[in-house]
């Protein structure tokens, strides 16, 4: 495999239900994502967009096919090993920021680093650098409720990359923001991806933002296709 390929899906199948109620969402889906690449996933609700992200992020097991991350096949691994890969290699950003309300912005970004075994000092330094990079270093001591929507989402992005993953999966990361704020947040996300060499798959309904990414894909009849 090309060493620059971070994520590769080969013939991925995903079903829900059984018997007469069996619903096939992904039907032999193929997709690859390279280091430093930002790809937009633009698809109507109900076509399998979130399912694709969940399978790619090792949150769900595919019913067929193969998921490979940085050259390592993830199918057949124990849940413990899948969790370890997820924590080490993958960052997630969602439409709702899911920040812990009782902790400051800085502490929210520190949390995954502390869980990963970094010292308090190391986590604090890294979190501060990320806040500065996202241009909200002055807001580090504020709790989520004291931040604007755009600031909250930038904290969520910083938290997602706190452990220096190689793959970023984002599900409608600007969906709750007004167009101007959405553009500003995407600018910050794009700069972070380019600077760090992350591979990013971003699900969005925002066609303007999708047009600024390297490629656009959709899901048609259970397969991933470019458009």
UniProtKB/Swiss-Prot annotation:
<dbReference type="InterPro" id="IPR003593">
    <property type="entry name" value="AAA+_ATPase"/>
</dbReference>
<feature type="binding site">
    <location>
        <begin position="43"/>
        <end position="50"/>
    </location>
    <ligand>
        <name>ATP</name>
    </ligand>
</feature>
<dbReference type="Pfam" id="PF00005">
    <property type="entry name" value="ABC_tran"/>
</dbReference>
<dbReference type="InterPro" id="IPR003439">
    <property type="entry name" value="ABC_transporter-like_ATP-bd"/>
</dbReference>
<keyword id="KW-0547">Nucleotide-binding</keyword>
<keyword id="KW-1003">Cell membrane</keyword>
<dbReference type="InterPro" id="IPR015854">
    <property type="entry name" value="ABC_transpr_LolD-like"/>
</dbReference>
<keyword id="KW-0997">Cell inner membrane</keyword>
<dbReference type="GO" id="GO:0022857">
    <property type="term" value="F:transmembrane transporter activity"/>
</dbReference>
<dbReference type="GO" id="GO:0044874">
    <property type="term" value="P:lipoprotein localization to outer membrane"/>
</dbReference>
<dbReference type="GO" id="GO:0005886">
    <property type="term" value="C:plasma membrane"/>
</dbReference>
<keyword id="KW-0067">ATP-binding</keyword>
<comment type="function">
    <text>Part of the ABC transporter complex LolCDE involved in the translocation of mature outer membrane-directed lipoproteins, from the inner membrane to the periplasmic chaperone, LolA. Responsible for the formation of the LolA-lipoprotein complex in an ATP-dependent manner.</text>
</comment>
<dbReference type="InterPro" id="IPR017871">
    <property type="entry name" value="ABC_transporter-like_CS"/>
</dbReference>
<keyword id="KW-0472">Membrane</keyword>
<dbReference type="GO" id="GO:0089705">
    <property type="term" value="P:protein localization to outer membrane"/>
</dbReference>
<feature type="domain" description="ABC transporter">
    <location>
        <begin position="7"/>
        <end position="227"/>
    </location>
</feature>
<comment type="subunit">
    <text>The complex is composed of two ATP-binding proteins (LolD) and two transmembrane proteins (LolC and LolE).</text>
</comment>
<dbReference type="InterPro" id="IPR027417">
    <property type="entry name" value="P-loop_NTPase"/>
</dbReference>
<dbReference type="GO" id="GO:0016887">
    <property type="term" value="F:ATP hydrolysis activity"/>
</dbReference>
<dbReference type="InterPro" id="IPR017911">
    <property type="entry name" value="MacB-like_ATP-bd"/>
</dbReference>
<comment type="similarity">
    <text>Belongs to the ABC transporter superfamily. Lipoprotein translocase (TC 3.A.1.125) family.</text>
</comment>
<protein>
    <recommendedName>
        <fullName>Lipoprotein-releasing system ATP-binding protein LolD</fullName>
        <ecNumber>7.6.2.-</ecNumber>
    </recommendedName>
</protein>
<dbReference type="GO" id="GO:0005524">
    <property type="term" value="F:ATP binding"/>
</dbReference>
<keyword id="KW-0813">Transport</keyword>
<keyword id="KW-1278">Translocase</keyword>
């Amino acid at each position: 495999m090309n060493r620059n390929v971070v994520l590769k899906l080969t013939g991925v199948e995903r079903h829900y239900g059984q018997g007469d109620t069996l619903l096939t969402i992904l039907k032999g889906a193929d997709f690859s994502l390279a280091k430093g690449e930002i790809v937009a996933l633009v698809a109507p609700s109900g076509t399998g967009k979130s399912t694709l992200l969940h399978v790619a992020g090792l949150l769900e097991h595919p019913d067929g096919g193969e998921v490979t991350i940085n050259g390592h096949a993830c199918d057949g691994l124990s849940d413990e090993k899948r969790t370890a890969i997820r924590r080490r290699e993958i960052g997630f950003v969602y439409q709702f920021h899911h920040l812990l309300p009782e902790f400051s912005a800085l502490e929210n970004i520190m949390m995954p680093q502390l869980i990963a075994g970094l010292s308090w000092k190391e986590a604090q330094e890294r979190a501060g650098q990320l806040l500065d990079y996202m241009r909200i270093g002055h807001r580090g001591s504020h709790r989520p409720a004291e931040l604007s929507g755009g600031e909250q989402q930038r904290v969520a992005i910083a938290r997602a990359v706190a452990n220096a993953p190689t793959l970023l999966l984002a599900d409608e990361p600007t969906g709750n923001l007004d167009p101007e704020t959405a553009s500003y947040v995407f600018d910050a996300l794009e700069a972070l991806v380019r600077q760090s060499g992350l591979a990013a798959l971003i699900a969005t309904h925002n066609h303007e933002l999708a047009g600024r990414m390297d490629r656009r894909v959709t899901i048609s009849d259970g397969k991933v296709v470019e458009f």
